[in-house]
Amino acid sequence: MTSKNSIQKALYLAFERLQWSELRDSVPLTLSEQDLENLRGINEKISLSEVTDIYLPLSRLLNLIVKAKQQRGLVVDEFLGQKPSRSPYIISIAGSVAVGKSTTARILQALLRHWPEHPKVDLVTTDGFLYPLADLKRKGLLQRKGFPESYDMKMLVEFISAVKSGQPHVKAPIYSHVTYDRVKNQHQTVSQPDILILEGLNVLQTGLDSPVDTRRPFVSDFVDFSIYVDAEEPLLKQWYKERFLQFRSGAFSDKKSYFHHYSSLTDDEANTIAANIWDTINGPNLQLNIQPTRERAHLILQKGQDHLMSHVLMRK
């Protein structure tokens, strides 16, 4: 049987942290400590050195790739004798709950905006494409929230297709982590960005993963470059529990919060409930639907203790 390590060696170039950091090639750091503070997620200790060592080389790589795609587009337009077309470069960021996808996406957005070739960088999370809470309850999917079947994939694919085709104004639904639901009558408008970053649990899924229809398009069909943020499951579970405990005095403390009843839990009670949520929902979703898509990514960011990147794997 082929091992995971042998597959990764065949598909990827592997870099230790120091090796990867040397590929920065004098790209300037454009973020301050205050900028970084605004970009951090709950329970993440990311530092400017993490940005310098990991994200600056990655932003340089993406800049080179996007420029090459733009040049190729100009060649095709010239060959066809047509005016230059405007098709955004789409980057997807996948990974488990609590791995830090959102922080990775926000940092990349901030860095990529500083390159003159692509100053307009939009970020959309797939959370907004979860079915509304009432629909999830009606379909009996509340305990499957985050699983592929809990998303309105038709709406998501239509959105990403419209953005990719260059439509001038495309609306994406907005999700509230307070109400645990899609926000009614509010949208994020995406207007022909140079780059769109799409962040979510299952953005690497393909037709091969679908139990329903393997022929219909999937989000991954529209993505130009994909990133998977990885960590060992015991770490992910630990980070999820720590984040859950912090939410008690944060999001859960809001009386409008769907989870307000958790705000008064003791540490032991909160740990028990968080562990149960992981074991029954987030863990199985990771094992069944998210982790199996990892080797489809163009780049894998591997995290160790304290959310620090330890290795980077780049597709050959």
From Swiss-Prot:
* Chief site of localization: cytoplasm
The domain of life is Bacteria
EC class (word):
transferase
Pathway membership:
Cofactor biosynthesis; coenzyme A biosynthesis; CoA from (R)-pantothenate: step 1/5
State the reactions this protein catalyses: (R)-pantothenate + ATP = (R)-4'-phosphopantothenate + ADP + H(+)
Give the gene that encodes this protein: coaA
InterPro entries for the chain: P-loop_NTPase (IPR027417), PanK (IPR004566), PRK/URK (IPR006083)
Native organism taxonomy: Bacteria, Pseudomonadati, Pseudomonadota, Gammaproteobacteria, Alteromonadales
One annotated GO molecular function is: pantothenate kinase activity
What is the protein name for this chain? Pantothenate kinase
Q: Name one Pfam family in it.
A: PRK
Sites where the protein binds ATP: G95, S96, V97, A98, V99, G100, K101, S102
An individual GO BP term: coenzyme A biosynthetic process
Give the record's GO CC terms. cytoplasm
Localization recorded for this chain is: Cytoplasm
Name the source organism: Shewanella baltica (strain OS155 / ATCC BAA-1091)
Q: Which family does it belong to?
A: Belongs to the prokaryotic pantothenate kinase family.
- Record-listed E.C. numbers: 2.7.1.33
Keywords from the UniProt entry? ATP-binding, Coenzyme A biosynthesis, Cytoplasm, Kinase, Nucleotide-binding, Transferase
